[in-house]
């Protein structure tokens, strides 16, 4: 367990978390702006959850030697990944069992003091419908891939949560 503990407390582990989230955000923006796939409001919320994981990775990269910062990073990682998984599962349900009575809103419901869709419309303004399935890879939809991504984040969290929060041994 000491090798896992050292890895979980290392800058490399947090950098990998950060880079995977950056990769997901880059893919989302590529799909939106290059492939011209319109994101729905649930996609925008998932994008925000990935930004939470990205921020957790950044906190871990900067403060991997400090237990409090590792704790904050792990907490944000867990909350963001769990929220993202919940959203992805809801979107899969909307897409596999579309109902005229269950639709998503046209605008995201951000707090009044933080209207991200107005400040950064090219990133946070939804233009698509939740029931549309604009892209698949290997017969798996984008929302199903996000279930895989957020589940992987949660599994990795469980694997690393205990060693990441242990005190750092100073030599």
Swiss-Prot record:
The chain crosses the membrane at residues 14-30, 49-64, 72-89, 145-163. Residues 1-13, 65-71, 164-171 are cytoplasmic. GO terms for molecular function: electron transfer activity; protein-disulfide reductase activity. It is found in: Cell inner membrane. One of its GO terms (cellular component) is plasma membrane. Its main location: membrane. It comes from Shewanella loihica (strain ATCC BAA-1088 / PV-4). The keyword Membrane applies. Keywords: Cell inner membrane, Cell membrane, Chaperone, Disulfide bond, Electron transport, Membrane, Oxidoreductase, Redox-active center, Transmembrane, Transmembrane helix, Transport. It comes from the Bacteria. Belongs to the DsbB family. Disulfide bonds join 40-43, 104-130. Residues 31-48, 90-144 are periplasmic. One of its GO terms (biological process) is protein folding. This is Disulfide bond formation protein B. The lineage of its organism: Bacteria, Pseudomonadati, Pseudomonadota, Gammaproteobacteria, Alteromonadales. Required for disulfide bond formation in some periplasmic proteins. Acts by oxidizing the DsbA protein. It is a multi-pass membrane protein.
